[in-house]
Structures are given as C-alpha cells and as structure tokens.
C-alpha cells in the first residue's frame, strides 16, 4: 500500500513530545547535547517528510540549558512545515522546529496546532 504523497505538500503545525534520554542512551557525556540536536533534526525530518530542517535559537538554548552532559529528559517541541520562498531551493517545503511554551508532558500526545 503506497502512501499518498500529496499530503506532504500542505503546510501544517504539530506539537510533539520528544523523549531525549531514550535517544541518547549509551552516549558519552561530552556528546549528549550535540547529539540531542542531531536527534531532534532527525525526528523532525522523519515526521514531516522534509530533508531541510531549521531549528529555532530558543530550542537550542533549551537543549543546552543544563550544559553539555545534562540535557532535558523530555522536550515539548512544535514542528511547522512551511513553504520555501527561495526560487533556487531544492525542496518546496522545509520544517521549522521551536520549543513549546507549555513544557508539561503529562497526558499530552501529538497535537495539531491551529494557526491563528
């Protein structure tokens, strides 16, 4: 059964909880925060179907907030698939990842955010 490719062309914003400690298991201490950034990129690329992933400065500060060794266990992130305005861009869509305002994760799954 083939997936419908036309769905990946629409703009959408979703809110996810990413479990970083699960993704950083058996990583040496001095590589935890850089690997966490790479894992967030990989996660966003997978769920949104775009290879162009851009991270917000606030997200980077949230990952590095407790230093290089002690990254947050879970992080609530907002991923937006947006249209690329560059004429010479390889892809027509890109993903923009930022940190969610509400960091509580209890009872929250994936939420589609309605743009106002």
From Swiss-Prot:
GO molecular function annotations of the record: structural constituent of ribosome
Keyword Mitochondrion: no
Annotated CDD domains: Ribosomal_L31e
Keyword Magnesium: no
Keywords assigned: Ribonucleoprotein, Ribosomal protein
Protein's GO biological process: translation
GO CC terms, sorted: ribonucleoprotein complex; ribosome
Superkingdom as given in the UniProt entry: Eukaryota
InterPro entries noted in UniProt: Ribosomal_eL31 (IPR000054), Ribosomal_eL31_CS (IPR020052), Ribosomal_eL31_dom_sf (IPR023621)
Pfam families assigned: Ribosomal_L31e
Family as reported in the entry's similarity comment: Belongs to the eukaryotic ribosomal protein eL31 family.
The protein, known as: Large ribosomal subunit protein eL31
Gene giving rise to this polypeptide: RPL31
């Amino acid at each position: 059964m083939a997936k419908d490719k036309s769905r990946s062309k629409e703009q959408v914003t979703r809110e996810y909880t990413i479990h970083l400690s699960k993704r950083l298991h058996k990583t040496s201490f001095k590589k935890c925060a850089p690997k966490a950034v790479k894992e967030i990129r990989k996660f966003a690329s997978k769920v949104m179907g775009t290879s162009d992933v851009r991270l917000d400065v606030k997200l980077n500060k949230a990952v590095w907030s407790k230093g290089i060794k002690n990254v947050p266990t879970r992080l609530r992130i907002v991923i937006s698939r947006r249209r690329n305005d560059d004429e010479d861009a390889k892809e027509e869509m890109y993903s923009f990842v930022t940190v969610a305002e509400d960091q509580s994760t209890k009872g929250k799954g994936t939420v589609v955010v309605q743009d106002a």
